[in-house]
């Protein structure tokens, strides 16, 4: 572990893990951690395992090399400070306790529906950093930084879902109180405490709505300086196109298909336990007696306190139906709760099933009506659906699975022995001759053949309607519409009686949908598909960040700007349907930052869905001017760098020194009398350590340790004497280099 390369939050995390004090300047934290590491190393060499906090304190102090010793040291220090600034803003996220821990602190609520309880447990955690940035008035879509592989990571952002090193609530409160006190004392020195981000208060309204959380995600990622580096695309191996397996082209993006493509599991089950995901097979059938098997091999572990259950829904569906099995026309599923589902209608059927159970799915096309039946562990459960052949027409039925928090394994007939023998005359779909099967669409051979369409427009402008209509009118392109409403559909629990969600749970579900959507966009950029990104995307920085992810795609932008009357009417309709309104502050922020995109290196084409550019530009300009008048002045972020270094650089350019704006030198008697004490003394430069000691004691109220800091600072008294004797005639140069001079050796 290289201590000097660690950032402030990482230093604090390592110290807390060892039970050591995590308050103070970065220099103190680094030395404290280095001493602990030295003590652990010495004890390991001596054969004593596990150095505790006491052993670390007994270790010999090891000085940490000061950064910025050379001519380029200041620049390197500034870069580190910039990174620490971002860390300070994200520090709330790093210290946020996991939902399970937060649930343990709260009182146990009365029994509620599973979905509501799980989401309320999640909401006990602290606010995300996106919430802190969304409320600020200065979000204007600047350049981006790596939102992480990491969006989500975070925003970024690291893309990892969890942050290590969570701490106990009591210790955290004590640490925060101590940090606040240290920051008050260390403000003049530009310490880390001064850079600590301050979270904004939550809005009084508990329920915010979809547009609010979409704006939060955009505002959070707008701090990014560059898009995250795209991961290398996995090379597709040559596959036998006659095999029946799960189709990676039509499956959900968040469904992780196994390597052999005969099974899979949800990708975000731990972060988003309410999210359903699934896939269809590559082949369907239109005649005969055909079957396949599905087994729940494992229920995925979930966070402590999460009340979500593991479920599998298995059955048949036609091509082009939605991925939610049983919730669309010509989509038929058998649910693990002992329910059958067709076109969104649920009825009781058969038995419940779960881990290690095998469900047999049978389609009989040889009767007057197509009969779909199921079995559990070899036991026949009877016919669940009867479908008119006239209504089904020539559509093929494809095996389809949909799961939540579980791992599923499928047998299409590729196994030597089935889990349970099928009824007589039924054959596995893999045994059906290839010419009698119906193949689904083949994915593009290369990612360069794929296309992404970025929707741009204010909330309620009609982007979603345009995207859905365009995808329906171009079925051969098989567009995947990525929007918050699509994700919400996959997160909702449906059944005999849909549980009524309270505003708090509904608000949390919308928040999770926006976060999940950000991760799906990153996954989409590595998939050989066509996409429509159905979000507001009013920030130029957000447009750039997303489109740069799809660098090998054909990238198009569709701007939807209706006239004012139509937009107001659509907003009212949206409010009636979705039950939420866009907060005024969020709408003003979007208007103020909305500008029409122009064709550039990451936008191959810009088109307009309603009003053309000549008509849309005056409306957008009007929105922008009105919003800027109503918005409060933007709060500029305070410069949390080392203020002393910055002030010195500014003063050196004016021929001034460390204190004040007075021009100084050996001829300035007033300056020498004022600063150095006794009148009549010729102006000189007192020992650097004496001056630093006074500042240190005044700000931190503790004794200055000379030996501790002697390796960090040079003896400027000796250096300045050398400088004076060698350059007495060059007064101007002398003034310019009061602090910048490196001395002669």
UniProtKB/Swiss-Prot annotation:
| Region of interest (Disordered), ranges | 44-239, 625-664
Q: Which residues form the SAP domain?
A: 3-37
Q: Where does the record place Acidic residues bias?
A: 73-97, 230-239
- Omega-N-methylarginine-modified residues are 654, 682, 736, 745
Recorded hits in PROSITE patterns, A to Z, give: B302_SPRY, SAP
Q: Which domain of life is it from?
A: Eukaryota
**What does the UniProt keyword field contain?**
Methylation, Nucleus, Phosphoprotein
Extent of Basic and acidic residues compositional bias = 142-161, 183-221, 625-637
Q: Which residues carry this modification: Phosphothreonine?
A: 163
Residues modified as Phosphoserine: 159, 166, 183, 186, 224, 226
Basic residues bias: start-end ranges? 638-652
Which residues are in the B30.2/SPRY domain? 224-417
What are its GO cellular component terms? nucleoplasm; nucleus; synapse
How does the annotation summarize its subunit structure?
Binds to MLF1 and retains it in the nucleus.
Protein name as catalogued = Heterogeneous nuclear ribonucleoprotein U-like protein 2
> Which organism was this protein described from?
Mus musculus (Mouse)
């Amino acid at each position: 572990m290289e201590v000097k390369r660690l950032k402030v939050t990482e230093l604090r995390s390592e110290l807390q893990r060892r039970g050591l004090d995590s308050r103070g300047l970065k220099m103190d934290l680094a030395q404290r951690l280095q001493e602990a590491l030295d003590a652990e190393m010495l004890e390991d060499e001596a054969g004593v395992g596990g150095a505790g906090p006491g052993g670390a304190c007994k270790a010999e102090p090891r000085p940490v090399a000061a950064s910025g010793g050379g001519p380029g040291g200041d620049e390197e220090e500034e870069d580190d400070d910039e990174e620490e600034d971002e860390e300070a803003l994200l520090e709330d996220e790093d210290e946020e306790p996991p939902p399970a821990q937060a649930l343990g602190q709260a009182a146990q609520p009365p029994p509620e529906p599973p979905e509501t309880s799980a989401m309320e447990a999640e909401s006990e955690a602290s606010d995300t950093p996106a919430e802190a940035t969304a409320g600020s008035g200065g979000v204007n879509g600047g350049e981006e930084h790596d939102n992480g592989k990491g969006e989500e990571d975070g925003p970024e952002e690291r893309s990892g879902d969890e942050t290590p090193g969570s701490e106990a609530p009591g210790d955290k409160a004590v640490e925060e109180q101590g940090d606040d006190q240290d920051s008050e004392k260390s403000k003049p020195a530009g310490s880390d405490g001064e850079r600590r981000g301050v979270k904004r208060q939550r809005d009084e309204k508990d329920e915010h709505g979809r547009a609010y959380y979409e704006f939060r995600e955009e505002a959070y990622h707008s701090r990014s300086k560059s898009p995250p580096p795209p991961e290398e695309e996995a090379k597709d191996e040559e596959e036998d196109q006659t095999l029946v397996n799960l189709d990676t082209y039509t499956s959900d993006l968040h469904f992780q298909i196994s390597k052999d493509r005969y099974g899979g599991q949800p990708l975000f089950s731990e972060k988003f336990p309410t999210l359903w995901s699934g896939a269809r097979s590559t082949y369907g059938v239109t005649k005969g007696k055909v079957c396949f098997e599905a087994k729940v091999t494992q229920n995925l572990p979930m966070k402590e306190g999460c009340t979500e259950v593991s479920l599998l829904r298995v059955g048949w569906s036609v091509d082009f139906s939605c991925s939610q099995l049983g919730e669309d026309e010509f989509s038929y599923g058998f649910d693990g709760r002992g329910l059958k589902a067709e076109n969104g209608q649920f009825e009781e059927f058969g038995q419940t099933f779960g881990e290690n159970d095998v469900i047999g799915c049978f389609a009989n096309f040889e009767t007057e009506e197509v009969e779909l039946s199921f079995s559990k562990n070899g036991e026949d459960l009877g016919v669940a659906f009867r479908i008119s052949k006239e209504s089904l027409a020539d559509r093929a039925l494809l095996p389809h699975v949909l799961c939540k928090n579980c791992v599923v394994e499928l047998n299409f007939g590729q196994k030597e022995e089935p889990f349970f023998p099928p009824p007589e005359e039924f054959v596995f779909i893999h045994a059906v001759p290839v010419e009698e099967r119906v193949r689904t669409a083949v994915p593009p051979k290369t990612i360069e053949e794929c296309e992404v369409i970025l929707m741009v427009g204010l909330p309620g402008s009609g982007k979603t309607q345009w995207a859905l209509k365009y995808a329906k009118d171009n079925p051969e392109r098989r567009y995947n519409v990525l929007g918050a409403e699509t994700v919400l559909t996959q997160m909702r629990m449906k059944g005999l009686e849909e549980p009524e969600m309270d505003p708090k749970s509904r608000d949390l579900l919308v928040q999770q949908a926006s976060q999940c959507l950000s991760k799906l966009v990153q996954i989409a950029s590595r998939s050989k598909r066509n996409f429509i990104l159905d979000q507001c995307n009013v920030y130029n920085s957000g447009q750039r960040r997303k489109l740069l992810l799809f660098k090998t795609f054909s990238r198009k932008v569709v701007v939807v700007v209706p006239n004012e009357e139509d937009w107001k009417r659509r907003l009212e309709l949206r409010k009636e349907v979705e039950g939420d309104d866009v907060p005024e502050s969020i709408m003003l922020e979007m208007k103020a930052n909305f500008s029409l995109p122009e064709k550039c290196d990451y936008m191959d084409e810009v088109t307009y869905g309603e009003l053309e550019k000549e008509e849309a530009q005056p409306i957008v300009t009007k929105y922008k001017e009105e919003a800027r008048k109503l918005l409060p002045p933007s709060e500029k972020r305070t410069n949390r760098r080392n203020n002393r270094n910055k002030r010195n650089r500014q003063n050196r350019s004016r021929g001034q020194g460390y204190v004040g704006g007075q021009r100084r030198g050996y001829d300035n008697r007033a300056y020498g009398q004022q600063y150095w004490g006794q009148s009549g003394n010729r102006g000189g430069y007192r020992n650097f350590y004496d001056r630093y000691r006074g500042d240190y004691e005044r700000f931190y109220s503790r004794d200055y340790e000379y030996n501790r800091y002697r390796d960090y600072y040079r003896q400027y008294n000796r250096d300045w004497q050398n400088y004076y004797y060698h350059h007495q005639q060059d007064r101007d140069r002398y003034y310019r280099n009061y602090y910048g001079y490196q001395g002669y050796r």
